[in-house]
Amino acid sequence: MNITIVGAGIAGLSAAFELQQSGFEVMLLEDSDRLGGKILTSEIEGFNIDAGPDSFLTRDPEMRELCFSLGVGDELVPPTGKPAKVWVDGEMHNLPKRHFLGVPLDLEELDELSLLTEEGAKRAKLDLTLPDNKPKEGETVGSLIRRRLGDEVMDRLVGPLLGGINAGDADDLCLESGVPQLFNASQGDFSLVRSIQDFLKNQNRDPASPVFLTHPDGL
């Protein structure tokens, strides 16, 4: 049986590989001049730079299983190096020391964080008193974060971090299907930050286990 797959991003390439492994003849069609879709690694000044997503989440086994099927599973490593920073207004700024996918877990720390303005830090702290924390049906990541913590936390913390993970705009990313771990952590009745704190306390996950994995040569 011959099968045609349209689009050679990660989904198309993975489907083609699985079908070939099952004995099917596969034709892969791609409109652009390269394969990989959102995933693109370029060499700049001797360094491999990921222009799209630079790692994958380990909470689901599919990506790790695919890497082992491709023969590179033993080469996977957690991203390491200098702490992540965000470029805002012509300067590099540190992320909070404690955060969950960009959501700050210590709101008092925001007063000393150069990434946010004084007004942005004050707005974020309103999360502790605002009612109606639970996500609404079909709500996006951007909608929840802006509603609970304000625009600056979204634009300068959560947006850049999740944009790097998902290679897309977090304002358009469905919370429940796109970032299920944040959706599950935000089910408390009051305060998104406290809800996440309680969620993390109840997790049995090994804290030493990496949240992300990547390949040394880039995705």
What are these regions (language model features)?
Residues 2-28:
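N-terminal Rossmann-like FAD-binding beta1-loop-alpha1 element of flavoenzymes
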Residues 39, 43, 60, 158:
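Short, flexible helix/strand-to-coil boundary loops that buttress conserved ligand/catalytic motifs
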Residues 121-219:
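Active-site/ligand-binding neighborhood in enzyme catalytic cores
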Residues 20, 68, 147:
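Short polybasic/polar patches that bind polyanions
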Residues 6-9, 31, 52, 59, ...:
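A secondary-structure boundary/capping signal
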Residues 45-132:
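Dinucleotide-binding Rossmann-like beta1-alpha1 core, especially the glycine-rich loop
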Residues 20-44:
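Glycine-rich FAD pyrophosphate-binding loop
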